[in-house]
Amino acid sequence: MSLTLSLIMPREQALLAAALAPYLAEVAPRASIDPARCAGQMLNRKDVTAFWIRNGTQRIGFAIVLNLPDDRRELSEFCILPQHRRRGWGQEAARTLLREFPGRWRMGLSKSSADAVAFWGTCLSAMPGIRDLRQGAPFTEHQIKSYSFEIAGAHDD
């Protein structure tokens, strides 16, 4: 069964907060971030698109995309829930999400999650259609580095 993305609706704020709590503890353990408040902010911003990552009807993770000016995007948050990791679904979900929105992307990587740093290094280097992959400085004090890249669209050469 292949993975799909579905929009996270504002009425699902409590579900997103429940998924965010362990994720935030993993990626920003020293930050005091209220998952419920964070979920509310994410779901009510006009420049954010939030997705469930699904395997069939089961929610196995989420992705939060910040829509930036000039048709650029930032992968703000990306999580495959721990019980669903190490099955290839993270790479499949990343490919699905990025193919859905070709163009310029950026993302920061948490300094508290060595697994995420390793995952994204491998995932992006093997991503079909990726161009101009660059490693850069972190965006926040909670990050170790960032990536910027472009994903080719269906009609790009």
PLM segments and residue spans:
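Short amphipathic alpha-helix that is part of the acyltransferase structural core
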Residues: 1-34
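Conserved beta-strand-loop-alpha-helix junction that forms the acyl-donor binding cleft
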Residues: 106-121, 125, 135-144
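Conserved acetyl-CoA-binding loop-helix of GNAT-fold acetyltransferases
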Residues: 80, 86-99
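Short hydrophobic/aromatic beta-strand or adjacent loop that forms the aromatic wall/cage
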Residues: 48, 142-150
